[in-house]
Amino acid sequence: MPVVSLADLLESGVHFGHQTRRWNPRMDQYIYTARNGVHIIDLVQTAQLMEDAYEYVRSSTINGKKFLFVGTKRQAAGIISQEAQRCGAHYVNQRWLGGMLTNWETIRKRVDRLKELEALEASGGIDRRGKKEGSMLRRELGKLQKYLGGIKNMRKLPDVVVIVDQRREHNAIHECQKLGIPIIAMLDTNCDPDVVDVPIPANDDAIRSIKLIVGKLADAIYEGRHGQPDVSDDYEEFDEGLDGDNLEVEAAEEVEEAAEAEVAATPEA
């Protein structure tokens, strides 16, 4: 039985690319045709590459590899969180903070701070700090949970990174390349297949397309751990009216600045 059928791919709109004027010529090998000024992705290739990706993910999981899912656009954020948690992977679904991988030791200090504040809250310690200090601590806790909650249990760099929207997540791509971490990515017709290791040509803008592809990759991880994929199908859809390009940037920058401050305060060896 195939990992995904052509009918499922069609029904989920995986074949719809971008307008022809917005294409990346390097994606030509994965484009079937153009209709009404829109490129159509070759689903026969997508189905085969999904087979390859599924087996790669499943076998990597069996061999103890750890995965990080990355998708910060509004259409992907809820799916990334739900599917990563379902299969036991780590995830980033808000903003990619600079140095999240290449400056991991410093980011991990912020993760430790998150755990410290969560423990303090659970023990009632924040309530005992007074109104002003308690409010400041809760604000800090909220920001850390939002941007680092998905990697709270990640104690080392991931072995493989799964990305939705290669163009948007270019900072994550760059850090993975610098560290030699394999990249699995959904590739729309405006993407560059040369920067990923395991390509999956697919519409990376439609919720149903993202849900199908990311869900199958999560199934592969689940199967690698438990022998059979989980078949649960519920997920939270993000409001299509939200501006996913700039979700609480100021709060994210404060988390990032705190990490950078730790670097500056660390004496050179």
Swiss-Prot record:
Gene3D superfamilies: Glucose-6-phosphate isomerase like protein, domain 1 (3.40.50.10490), Helix hairpin bin (1.10.287.610). Keywords: Ribonucleoprotein, Ribosomal protein. It comes from the Bacteria. The keyword Ribosomal protein applies. One of its GO terms (cellular component) is cytosolic small ribosomal subunit. GO terms for molecular function: structural constituent of ribosome. Transmembrane segments: none annotated. One of its GO terms (biological process) is translation. Belongs to the universal ribosomal protein uS2 family. This is Small ribosomal subunit protein uS2. It comes from Synechocystis sp. (strain ATCC 27184 / PCC 6803 / Kazusa). The gene is rpsB.
